[in-house]
Amino acid sequence: RGMAGGQAFDLDSVGKTLSLPELEFMHIHKTGALIRAAVMLGARCSNRLDDQQLSRLDHFAKSIGLAFQVVDDLLDAEATTATLGKTAGKDAENNKPTYVSILGISQARELAEKLQHDAYQALDSFDEAALRLRQVTDFIIKRKF
């Protein structure tokens, strides 16, 4: 369950072929859960948001959580060790299932863009109040490390 369950699923998946829903499940419960917790804790501290706004922020958090992992998988496959600050290509070397190994680079990139779009849409009703969250989304998608 939760982040620990996601990590256990990750460790158990090494060397296995996962379906896209299984990979998403794993990342929703790992990186996604951490990002979602950060967003939702901040949202709940405001005491000014209604249930619909909280739901939209939750959708935003889920979208950027998965987007972060998709981009991480793309960087592992495409970037250099010097750029990443960690060993590039380690996922493939360790036979770990990734968005790139399941979808390929082109479709993984398309998925990252779709998740970015979903995140933006979730923030539509917040107008300028969500500017920083849009900037975080852009950073996640455009980062090089």
Regions found by a protein language model. Name each.
Residues 1-145:
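All-alpha prenyltransferase/terpene-synthase fold signal
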